[in-house]
UniProtKB/Swiss-Prot annotation:
Pfam families: Chal_sti_synt_C, Chal_sti_synt_N. One of its GO terms (molecular function) is naringenin-chalcone synthase activity. Keywords: Acyltransferase, Flavonoid biosynthesis, Transferase. Transmembrane segments: none annotated. This is Chalcone synthase. The active site is at C164. The gene is CHS. It catalyses: (E)-4-coumaroyl-CoA + 3 malonyl-CoA + 3 H(+) = 2',4,4',6'-tetrahydroxychalcone + 3 CO2 + 4 CoA. It is an enzyme of class 2 (transferase). PANTHER family: CHALCONE SYNTHASE 1, HYDROXYMETHYLGLUTARYL-COA SYNTHASE. The primary product of this enzyme is 4,2',4',6'-tetrahydroxychalcone (also termed naringenin-chalcone or chalcone) which can under specific conditions spontaneously isomerize into naringenin. Its EC number is 2.3.1.74. The keyword Membrane does not apply. It comes from Perilla frutescens (Beefsteak mint).
């Protein structure tokens, strides 16, 4: 007689969840950060606000961002002046864009990941889709299933309105799915388009202006599964553990509200301080069981909320400058793409590790950490193990 325990044992995978492929995509429209203040104040009819423009210029200069990609073009914004005002009803116009474009950009990234994975898409058993850009029913997960031609029986999870920490959340969810379902292959997609948050400047809300200096568009996809098929599937990173926590005394530090005017973001100045003050506790909880307490001995993938967060984390933990190299590279080349960022950094790290002849996908190191920070303040901590590179 078969018992429930027997069935349960057979349902579980044997090994840890692994990232098997990564794909990324951006809109074609590329924006140069050095000329963006002139463009932004022109397109929002705000050139008369010279003091505010000077402040914005300084924000852009300090951002450490070289360029960003944006779906919104100058032509489109000229035709939709409500989206260039600071607080004009414009949700319908914004929704019309993102409901269509978020799944499409996600498809581009997913196709690249599926191609690298090397298996037929019919073997995808689960889909986890995450976006902070727009809300619809049926969701972006449904639209992507149709766009990619996935099986109708694929098990879908849709995560809307989570914000910048969610790149860690999707990996945590994919890990649980892969390890608890033998043979599961989870397609994870984060797709973000700033059409919901773009707005003109305001003297009274400089935190909104910070977002306009940082946010960019992008989508990233990964395939996650346990027990890779030898010779067919090539693991890149193992997902060893995952945790989420709400930081103490951080209520209201980062808020986002969906209104008639679109998605409004509100930031407190002490966000970098709150994160850097509490980050070591998360590290100790994650790496204590492994006997690791030297934060320079692990590779780093941190959501680049902005340069101030990275600078303060680096200073607080005494990190060597090269630790956040991949993180800063992605911030510089793409800006803050919310949930998609950490997956872009994961991709950058494995590529640069191979290119530079390092012994593992984690810059030659075995253990690594992936951090997501976002509204709450919520922090996601994922412990990674690299895979040897056969150079």
């Amino acid at each position: 007689m078969v018992t429930v325990e027997d069935i349960r044992r057979a349902q579980r995978a044997e090994g840890p969840a692994t990232v098997m492929a990564i794909g990324t995509a951006t809109p074609e429209n590329c924006v140069d950060q050095s000329t963006y203040p002139d463009y932004y104040f022109r397109i929002t009819n705000s050139e008369h606000r010279t003091d505010l423009k000077e402040k914005f210029k300084r924000m852009c200069e300090k951002s450490m961002i070289r360029k960003r990609y944006m779906h919104l073009t100058e032509e489109f914004l000229k035709e939709n002046p409500n989206m260039t005002a600071y607080m004009a009803p414009s949700l319908d116009a914004r929704q019309d864009i993102v409901v269509v474009e978020v799944p499409k950009l996600g498809k581009e990234a997913a196709q690249k990941a599926i191609k690298e994975w090397g298996q037929p898409k019919s073997k995808i058993t689960h889909l986890v889709f995450c976006t902070t850009s727009g809300v619809d029913m049926p969701g972006a997960d449904y639209q992507l299933t149709k766009l990619l031609g996935l099986r109708p029986s694929v098990k879908r999870f849709m995560m809307y309105q989570q914000g910048c920490f969610a790149g860690g959340t999707v990996l945590r969810m994919a890990k649980d799915l892969a390890e608890n379902n033998a043979g599961a292959r989870v397609l994870v997609v984060c797709s973000e388009i700033t059409a919901v948050t773009f707005r003109g400047p305001s003297e009274s809300h400089l935190d909104s202006l910070v977002g306009q200096a940082l946010f960019g568009d992008g989508a990233a996809a990964v395939i996650v599964g346990s027990d890779p098929v030898v010779g067919v599937e090539r693991p890149l990173f193992q997902l060893v553990s995952a945790a989420q926590t709400i930081l103490p005394d951080s209520d209201g530090a980062i808020d986002g509200h969906l209104r008639e005017v679109g998605l409004t973001f509100h930031l407190l100045k002490d966000v970098p301080g709150l994160i850097s003050k509490n980050i070591e506790k998360s590290l100790k909880e994650a790496f204590g069981p492994l006997g690791i307490s030297d934060w320079n001995s692990v590779f780093w993938i941190a959501h680049p909320g902005g340069p101030a967060i990275l600078d303060q984390v680096e200073a607080k933990l005494g990190l060597k400058p090269e630790k956040l190299r991949s993180t800063r590279h992605v911030l510089g080349e793409y800006g803050n793409m919310s949930s998609a960022c950490v997956l872009f950094i994961l991709d950058e790290m494995r590529k640069s590790s191979a290119k530079e002849g390092m012994s593992s996908t984690g810059e030659g190191l075995d253990w690594g950490v992936l951090f997501g920070f976002g509204p709450g303040l919520t922090v996601e901590t994922v412990v990674l193990h690299s895979v040897p590179i056969n150079n």
